[in-house]
Amino acid sequence: MNGFETVDNIEAYNNLAEAIVTLACEDYRSYRKQLRKATSRLEMEQLAREKHDVELNIRLLNSKILEIEKFLSSPYGMMLSHQLGDVILEKLRNE
């Protein structure tokens, strides 16, 4: 067993995965809603900056997903990947 294989770490990775999905969905929905409401050029410029921030957030979240995938590709993680994958897929379906 290595440090990644404790119950607390598995639970933490599961919580992180759920938070990543939730945050990415909320950021994107918020951006799209504001974009529809934008009426002036200044609002559009501000939204373009916010879109850039959202894109940066998504890149950061993607790097966290890669960390999770690395863990899940470990021998111990592979045993858990189906269970965690099901949780993540269910969360995505519900969003």
What are these regions (language model features)?
Residues E69-E95:
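Short, compact, well-ordered microdomains
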Residues R36, E43-H52:
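N-terminal accessory regions of S-adenosyl-L-methionine
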Residues R41, K64-I65, G85:
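Short amphipathic alpha-helical segments that mediate assembly, nucleic-acid/protein binding
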Residues R32-L35, T39, F71-L72, L92:
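Hydrophobic residues in alpha-helical segments
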Residues A48, D53-Y76:
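Acidic, low-complexity, intrinsically disordered interaction modules
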Residues T22-C25, M44, N57:
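Helix-centric, low-specificity signal for extended rod-like, repetitive segments
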Residues A17, R32-L35, L56, P75, ...:
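Generic alpha-helical secondary structure signal
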Residues N2-A38:
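N-terminal acidic leader/helix
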